[in-house]
């Protein structure tokens, strides 16, 4: 069997690829592997606003209960809430049902260990082995030894209070726009900013089960960019479906991506002496402009493979406090063990208030190099063709020669979708756009 787990849990089209049976199996195997030896283990379960969440939650919980574990239902909360509450509630594990920024037909299941960290490859493989063995050796308790489920009504409030306490003062006098992507942040983000005294304007906070990420949120920020200007806001924030990431919008309606957010937060933490070893952890997808800006600010960069799990691994290895991705996954390890959109938004807003400058002014120390990202739809079993085909390899070499050291080519298979991502950076936008599309078309022609 192919590996079930991708870079962010198990993901697929709900009810065909990610079926109720698979959710049951994951619940049963996950509860067994993650809580072995624990007496009446406790596992938290949450979901985003997708229509398929109810079906998958029911099946997943049935699997958890079938091995005698307790399932604590958190309801609709952001992914980072699961990471935080797993620690806060002394649970043995946490599970989030979400496909993050993907369209509504997708869903996913990702596990957190008892410390709120995403699982290692070894633990994920262990869960898969239990399923493939047809649950050999896994107990099937009866009677009073079966598990029970209970609903934790305070989950959303507890997470929101935690997020608010990550900034040292209120946001009174600030006008802030939020795009909740009709997803998991639609209550917590609005409440947190309002409780802190901001004047809050909200769009896409009315989920109906089918409109999550639909032309909104961090993958479609255009509406928010217009809205910030229209309402005269100081800044805006766009979350994705499960609110583990966010992007910002400045007072002029310009999108501020994760690279800028990381630079801004790293610079502030360095100024107040809280950036461990003056080091920021990013991925190979970060813009070269971030390298240049950080060099000028005296900030060192550590680079990892793409995926917030790899950023987190590097951070925990050397106790770095800040890391993230251009996509808006930002990890403040002093506060949470995963990307946290609400915590990120609160940090940015508090820095803008503290510095008494506009977001555009604070971001002006960094200049982005033109960057183009083209997705080529490629079946999962052909994703490595760019490594093996001589014509593609030669085309990459030719592009690198033309860029002449000022830019780069990066090709990366998606860990969650049947895509190969072709990314180019260089000084000339038109030139790299043409090169990126040409290379993507060449990859497609080889399928």
UniProtKB/Swiss-Prot annotation:
GO terms for molecular function: magnesium ion binding; phosphoglucosamine mutase activity; phosphomannomutase activity. The modification Phosphoserine is found at residue 100. Coiled coil: none annotated. Mg(2+) binds at residues 100, 240, 242, 244. The active site is at 100 (phosphoserine intermediate). It catalyses: alpha-D-glucosamine 1-phosphate = D-glucosamine 6-phosphate. GO terms for cellular component: cytosol. Binds 1 Mg(2+) ion per subunit. GO terms for biological process: carbohydrate metabolic process; peptidoglycan biosynthetic process; UDP-N-acetylglucosamine biosynthetic process. Activated by phosphorylation. Its EC number is 5.4.2.10. PROSITE patterns: PGM_PMM. Keywords: Isomerase, Magnesium, Metal-binding, Phosphoprotein. Gene3D superfamilies: Alpha-D-Glucose-1,6-Bisphosphate, subunit A, domain 3, Alpha-D-phosphohexomutase, C-terminal domain. Belongs to the phosphohexose mutase family. Catalyzes the conversion of glucosamine-6-phosphate to glucosamine-1-phosphate. PANTHER family: PHOSPHOGLUCOMUTASE (ALPHA-D-GLUCOSE-1,6-BISPHOSPHATE-DEPENDENT), PHOSPHOHEXOSE MUTASE. This is Phosphoglucosamine mutase. It comes from Clostridium botulinum (strain Alaska E43 / Type E3). The gene is glmM.
């Amino acid at each position: 069997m192919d590996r079930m787990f991708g870079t962010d849990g198990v993901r697929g089209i709900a009810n065909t690829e990610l079926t109720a049976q698979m959710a049951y199996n994951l619940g049963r195997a996950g509860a067994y592997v993650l809580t072995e030896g624990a007496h009446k283990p406790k596992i938290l379960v949450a979901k985003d606003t997708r229509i398929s969440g109810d079906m998958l939650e029911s099946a997943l919980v049935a699997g958890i209960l079938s091995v005698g574990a307790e399932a604590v239902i958190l309801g609709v909360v952001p992914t980072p809430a699961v990471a935080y509450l797993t620690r806060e509630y002394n649970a043995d594990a946490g599970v989030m049902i979400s496909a993050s920024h993907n369209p509504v037909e997708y869903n996913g299941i990702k596990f957190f260990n008892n410390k709120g960290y995403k699982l290692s490859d070894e633990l994920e493989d262990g869960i898969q082995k239990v399923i493939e063995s047809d649950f050999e050796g896994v107990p099937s308790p009866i009677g009073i030894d079966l598990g029970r489920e209970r609903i934790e009504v305070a989950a959303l409030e507890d997470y929101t209070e935690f997020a608010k306490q990550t900034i040292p003062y209120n946001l009174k006098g600030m006008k802030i726009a939020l795009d909740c992507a009709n997803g998991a942040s639609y209550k917590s983000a609005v409440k947190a900013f309002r409780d802190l005294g901001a004047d809050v304007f909200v769009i896409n906070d009315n989920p109906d089960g089918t409109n999550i990420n639909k032309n909104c949120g961090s993958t479609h920020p255009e509406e928010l960019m217009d809205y910030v200007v229209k309402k005269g806001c100081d800044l805006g924030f766009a979350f994705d479906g499960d609110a583990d990431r966010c992007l910002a919008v400045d007072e002029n309606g310009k999108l501020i991506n994760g690279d800028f957010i990381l630079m801004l937060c790293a610079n502030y933490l360095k100024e107040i002496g809280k950036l461990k070893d003056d080091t920021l952890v990013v991925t190979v997808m970060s813009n070269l402009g971030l390298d240049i800006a950080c060099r000028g600010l005296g900030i060192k960069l550590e680079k990892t493979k793409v995926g917030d799990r790899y950023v987190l691994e590097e951070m925990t290895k050397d106790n770095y406090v800040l890391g993230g991705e251009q996509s808006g996954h930002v990890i403040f390890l002093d506060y949470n063990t995963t990307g946290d959109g609400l915590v990120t938004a609160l940090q940015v807003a508090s820095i803008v208030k503290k510095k008494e400058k506009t977001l555009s002014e604070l971001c002006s120390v960094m200049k982005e190099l033109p960057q183009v990202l083209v997705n080529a739809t490629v079946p999962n079993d052909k994703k490595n063709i760019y490594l093996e085909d001589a014509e593609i390899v030669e085309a990459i070499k030719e592009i690198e020669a033309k860029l002449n050291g000022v830019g780069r080519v990066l090709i990366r298979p998606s860990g969650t979708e049947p895509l190969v991502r072709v990314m180019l950076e260089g000084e000339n936008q038109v030139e790299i756009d043409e090169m990126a599309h040409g290379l993507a078309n060449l990859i497609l022609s080889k399928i």
